[in-house]
């Protein structure tokens, strides 16, 4: 079949590669005029995210990620409150994206193609229209167009992301810029600090060019802080040019007075090692935390994938994993079924269940950490994983 994938992020790339390898004629369309980049933002590398690279592309997992062997909690006085053995792998969005993109044929990944609409959803073909005037007609269209999905908004106009009540401040610092004491305390672990109505986590990730050797890595932080709507959130999301953003503020866009407040708060409330990381971050950025639950992913000859479908909070480190898992499930369903609509319905049933349980689990984690203050170090329900903690 001829298949168009709308959206060229990690989920769209994984879908395009798997469907191509299964024998389909696939093109991936990305709205950005240039290859994507997220300034090395860290991700927990769950098996679903790396599966294509390790199973199909022969990539060594050690070349794209950093292994840690402990979960560590700090007290405000910088001492270790709790520590347990647990193996994780961490990478960066850019590292995984670049590896997946290198597996694509250049003509199969098409930039500067932002979708504006499509037609003939229930007929024998689907024609997608792009902002540059081009069109593409396919047997199937996979919408992997992210949090602000035009496809979802069109197909399910009542399904809007719900603000969770807090945002994630993010940033990273090269390990050589940190003191030896801080590097030692943060080494070989994901490190947490939990305090009233907030928590922060720190972990090592590859360098900006994918370096994984000690001395060449970054330390990445994700700091969840509550902001109320009706003024506080809107002020935070107003960038240095006075434009109010809705979903995120990229590096370099956060207003200086908000960065100053964040650094002051860090020095007053966080352990010294984590505060050092915060203060030395050159360009912190912000991602708003949302939930979104939908009950349909297949629509005629089209389907939703990844964040264009169900959207969970980041507390399970499973955003990219869910998108990749959707891609594997879609490919498997098409392979098992001769009838397209049956295949898409099978995909929908499978991945709705995955998405719904993830949303329920991450909503509970967020509620416990940001509002109920019932987070307990060592609780196994807090372990990362897509389909269950630790999986």
Regions found by a protein language model. Give the residues of each.
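N-terminal Rossmann-like FAD-binding beta1-loop-alpha1 element of flavoenzymes
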Residues: 2-28
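C-terminal helical "tail/cap" subdomain of flavin- and related membrane-associated enzymes
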Residues: 1, 21, 62, 252, ...
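Conserved Rossmann-like nucleotide-cofactor binding loop
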Residues: 11, 34, 148
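FAD-binding beta-loop-beta segment adjacent to the flavin cofactor pocket
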Residues: 285-313
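Active-site-adjacent segment of FAD-dependent monooxygenases/related oxidoreductases
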Residues: 32-104, 369
